Amino acid sequence: MTEKRLAQISVVLSTIIIMTYAFLSSYFLNKPLNLSSADLMYFALSNLLSLSLPFVCAWFPYLFVRPAAVTGSALSAFGLFLFFAITSSTMDDPKGAAAIWVIYFFWLIGAALAGVYPALFKPHFFTKTATRALVLSALFTVVVSFIIGFLISRIA
C-alpha cells in the first residue's frame, strides 16, 4: 500500500466516523426534548461543523509536507477525538461535557497552527523519511498543539 493511499484511507475513515458520531449524538441526545425537525437538523449541522472542522484543520497543513505526515496527523487527531468523545460520554454533568469539547476545539486549532511550521519551511528532519514524517506529525499534533491550544485558551 502506498503512502498516499494510506493517507487517503486514514483521513476518509476518520472523517466518516466523526460525521457519524456527530449526527447520531445530535439525534439521540435531543430526541427526548421533542425538538422540531428544523431545530434538530440545525443542531446536527452545527455539531458536525464544530467536530469535523477542527479535525480537518489539524491535518490540512501537512498536505504540503508529505502523505505520511497527513496520516500521522489525521490518526493522532482522530485519537484525540476518540479520547474526548469517550470522556464526554462518561461525564454526568452536561456543562463538563461541553467544556471537554471546547478543549478539543482549542487543541485541534493549536494543531493547525503547529502544522504551519512544517508546511511552510519543510525542515529536513521532517521530510527525510516517511516514518519520521508520520511520527513527527503525530507528535506535533498531540504535544505542540496542546501547548499552543493552551496558550490560545488562556488568551481568549
UniProtKB/Swiss-Prot annotation:
Its main location: membrane. It is a multi-pass membrane protein. The chain crosses the membrane at residues 7-29, 42-64, 69-88, 98-120, 133-155. The keyword Cell membrane applies. GO terms for cellular component: plasma membrane. Keywords: Cell membrane, Membrane, Transmembrane, Transmembrane helix. It is found in: Cell membrane. This is Uncharacterized protein PM1189.
